[in-house]
A protein has these predicted regions:
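Glycine-rich phosphate-binding loops of nucleotide-dependent enzymes
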Residues: 1-202
Length: 202
């Protein structure tokens, strides 16, 4: 399912995302993910539990390649030890190959395979946005939070993003919650919409 969270600036939309990802801790109440209380978990534990997100302002490792930006998100899933890493033993080589194949698989969703070796900071704005989404997907989430994914995009890039988000839902069978001010995008892809104002649902 794709759901939208809309409302005016300052309504508390990003605060909701920050609460869901444990950037902020709620003063009372509980936060449930698949029936499990995730209140009090660290951001790493939240990610391990199945929540991944993007940000209003793009956060990439600009000096790393596109592929490296994706594989770095797979770190918690990698199972080789320090010795294997230093000596490049078979477990290291196998895990690195798996990470490479997974990164290329993700890049193929957005038709970005030919950008794998490009420096992330050199990508066009729209491609950087898509890369941030792919990096979040690399953590294998069950819930993907997209914070204004179309911000700064031109109509052509927004149309492409719309197709990308639908492809994510259909390919990964995950829930997507997005904050967005582009009402055309919201109306075109969201199956449910919640409106937030002054921190309250209306």
């Amino acid at each position: 399912e794709i759901a939208g969270l809309i409302g005016p600036n300052g309504a508390g939309k990003t605060t909701v995302f920050n609460l869901l990802t444990s950037v902020y801790q709620p003063t009372h109440g509980t936060i449930l993910l698949d029936g499990k209380d995730i209140h009090g978990m660290s951001t790493a534990q939240i990610n391990h539990a199945g929540i991944a997100r993007t940000f209003q302002n793009i956060r990439l490792f600009s000096n790393l390649t596109v592929e490296e930006n994706i594989t770095v998100a797979m770190g918690p899933q990698i199972k080789y030890g320090l010795a294997s890493s230093i000596l490049h033993l078979p477990p290291y080589r196998w895990e690195e190959r798996v990470a490479h194949e997974r990164a290329m698989e993700l890049l193929s969703i957005f038709h970005m395979e030919d950008m794998a070796n490009a420096q992330a900071g050199s990508l066009p704005y729209g491609a950087q946005r898509r890369l941030e989404i792919l990096r979040a997907l690399a953590t294998n989430p069950s819930l993907l939070l997209l914070d204004e994914p179309a911000a700064g995009m031109n109509p052509s890039e927004t149309a492409e993003l719309t197709d990308n988000i639908l492809a994510i839902r259909d390919t990964f069978k995950i829930a997507v919650l997005l904050i967005e001010h582009d009402m055309n995008l919201v109306m075109n892809i969201c199956e449910g919409i919640a409106v937030l104002n002054f921190g309250k649902l209306i």
